[in-house]
A protein has these predicted regions:
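Sec-dependent N-terminal signal peptides
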Residues: 14-21
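Short, surface-exposed loop and linker segments with low hydrophobicity and enrichment for Pro/Ser/Thr
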Residues: 14, 94-97, 275-276
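Mature extracytoplasmic/luminal segments of secretory-pathway proteins
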Residues: 21-22, 202, 257, 316
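Short alpha-helical segments used as structural interaction elements across diverse proteins
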Residues: 8-9, 281, 300, 315
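Positively charged n-region of N-terminal signal peptides that target proteins for export
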Residues: 2-13
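Low-complexity, intrinsically disordered short segments enriched for Gly/Pro and polybasic residues
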Residues: 1, 16, 224, 306-309
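Extended beta-strand/loop cores of jelly-roll/beta-sandwich
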Residues: 6, 25-186, 306-321
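Functional-site microenvironments in short loops/helix caps that host divalent-cation chemistry
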Residues: 70, 76, 81, 119, ...
Length: 321
């Protein structure tokens, strides 16, 4: 059985796309490695169509309404004390850009689907990744998609919650339709740090709980099969429910993992620098889901990755310009 989302019971699951740090605790037919969950189409008919062919409506000219502007400049990316793939830190010049204040919601994504007739990867495959809290493993749930995150037999997703069960391909298609794009993970980190070389761990400061209040929708519980609901949400929460960060952004830690534009690769100077697979993209931010990295997954520097056709119930995105 799956814990049902209610606006007062929604809580966590980790699997960064997001499974860079978690997935070793489950066996999933989507896994291509112990740290990735991927969907492999068994028939040619299941392969993703070209995004341009799927988007029937003419892409809009992007609007910066609801976006935060960042001036850009020099920033130190990564962490000396973080996970191996966050090292070594290096200087990066970021050009000026805009980033959505909020995650793309179910309501936002519905407008895209209605305007274009787009079919997501989850709909093409007929299933998507959902975590079974009782059994303690990931499953491909038939019929789970952006509209029915726990399957068609369960309630629809709330319109003001972040859209989930969207692959990198799906996020790219939405961004193109909206006249925007996905942020690079370096832009994402710059924004999470509010453009400053700060020592703060998170986008809001150094503590997950401030004056008795949780600052983000994050996992509470001793293990992945023993969730507690101390922040008010069992699974996803409405976008912005935990307030704005100093940058003006919301949900830059927890709630859902966020797809980034770039291919995942080792940082300059690392043993894996230059090694990459174009089918594996970066993701940032952590989610409501349990993570073996624990609180580290919500930091501004933590990295995750997954394949472009993977969709999960704790993965979403926001757009940039």
């Amino acid at each position: 059985m799956y814990f049902i989302l209610s606006d007062k019971l929604m809580k966590r699951i980790y699997l960064p796309i997001m499974l860079w740090a978690l997935i070793c605790c489950t066996e999933n037919k989507k896994n291509t490695e112990s740290t990735e969950v991927s969907q492999e189409a068994s028939k040619e008919s299941k392969k993703a169509s070209d995004t341009k062919e799927q988007i029937k409506a003419k892409p809009k000219t992007g609007s910066t309404d609801g976006m935060i502007h960042f001036d850009g400049g020099s920033i130190i990316i990564g962490s000396e004390s973080g996970m191996p793939d966050e090292q070594p830190p290096f200087e990066k010049i970021i050009e000026p850009f805009y980033l959505d204040k909020n995650l793309v919601t179910v309501g936002d994504f519905r407008k895209f689907i209605q305007a274009t007739g787009f079919k997501t990867d989850a709909d093409k495959f007929g299933d998507s990744g959902v975590f079974d809290f009782e059994q303690g493993n990931w499953n491909l749930m038939k019929g789970a998609n952006w509209e029915y995150p726990l399957g068609p037999q369960m309630p629809k997703a709330e319109e003001n919650h972040p859209v989930t069960h969207v692959s990198w391909n799906d996020a790219q298609a939405y961004a193109t339709w909206a006249g925007k794009r996905l942020p690079t993970e370096f832009e994402w980190e710059y924004a999470a740090k509010n453009g400053k070389n700060t020592t703060d761990k998170y986008a809001w400061g150094n503590q997950l709980i401030v004056k008795g209040r949780y600052m983000a929708n994050v996992w509470q519980g001793e293990s992945v099969t023993e969730p507690e609901v101390l922040d008010g949400f069992m699974l996803t929460s409405p976008v912005g429910a935990f307030g704005e960060h100093p940058s003006g952004l919301t949900d830059m830690g927890g709630n859902v993992w966020q797809w980034c534009a770039n291919t995942y690769a080792g940082y300059p100077g690392s043993p894996t620098a230059g090694q990459k697979d174009e089918a594996v993209k970066s993701a940032r931010g952590g989610s409501f889901m349990y993570d073996q990295a624990e609180d580290a997954s919500f930091t501004t520097t933590f990295r995750s990755k997954n394949t472009t056709d993977t969709s999960l119930f704790n993965t979403g995105f926001r757009c940039a310009m």
